Amino acid sequence: MASLMLNGAITFPKGLGSPGSNLHARSIPRPTLLSVTRTSTPRLSVATRCSSSSVSSSRPSAQPRFIQHKKEAYWFYRFLSIVYDHVINPGHWTEDMRDDALEPADLSHPDMRVVDVGGGTGFTTLGIVKTVKAKNVTILDQSPHQLAKAKQKEPLKECKIVEGDAEDLPFPTDYADRYVSAGSIEYWPDPQRGIREAYRVLKIGGKACLIGPVYPTFWLSRFFSDVWMLFPKEEEYIEWFKNAGFKDVQLKRIGPKWYRGVRRHGLIMGCSVTGVKPASGDSPLQLGPKEEDVEKPVNNPFSFLGRFLLGTLAAAWFVLIPIYMWIKDQIVPKDQPI
């Protein structure tokens, strides 16, 4: 969730933001496929709360980032899990934001089978089990430390807990009614592959709901996001969903209510993207081998340490932003933009 707090650029009726969690880990081998080239540019489809134009900034398509290996993300969350629910979520992923972001997922029936990919400490899962029976929900994450926190939450006692890789899900094809992933895409080396997997595991007519950050416009936030992890553009989310085969793709902007007017400063923007699986079976999109072997160790421990420290500095920036904006919200009259 921490990663949501740094983007946006115009004023919307509701705020925006994003969750923070992780996923990946032990992968289950799947057949290697060949890559294909797509030449058409998908049209941006946006929900009614969102203007049709994107306010995200441009960035290099292959921009390197701080956490480039899932093992590094594993260690990052080894320590973040200690304070995640009490320090990160209050400023970046509130209960109101969570419920607002999950609304497009249509979690309308208690007997739905739901997978929460990158579920982490289970904060997003707590929103899911408000309407879906816990025994029908599976929480998947690469971090055993995050999952240990989820196991301690009473409403989640009946949920299935799985260590796994978002880009190689340990579920059969046509398995779930709903796929939810909040604050995980930031750590995916290949987001298109992860969304393709979302398509595969859903039943026909099933819906995927992916919640994540959007690339910022504020220059300092752009700098930290470029060196830290993945912050997609709104149109990239739409394209990835459509490439995977999803129909009725919608995007909804989300954020904390007390971020009044700050989008004009380019500080924050997050989104909830949904798509419906139109046919049973695997995704029509074919991809080559995975870019990253999660079983491989980190190549250079000194390089890893340097990137880890730099990423910690970037994370500190994202923690300070909501504190600053909360103070301004208390000072500035409610009828004036911040």
From Swiss-Prot:
GO terms for biological process: methylation; plastoquinone biosynthetic process; vitamin E biosynthetic process. Its main location: plastid. Residues 200-213 are annotated as: SAM motif III. Signal peptide: none annotated. Pathway: Cofactor biosynthesis; tocopherol biosynthesis. The chain crosses the membrane at residues 308-328. Residues 159-172 are annotated as: SAM motif II. This is 2-methyl-6-phytyl-1,4-hydroquinone methyltransferase, chloroplastic. It comes from Arabidopsis thaliana. The lineage of its organism: Eukaryota, Viridiplantae, Streptophyta, Embryophyta, Tracheophyta. The gene is VTE3.
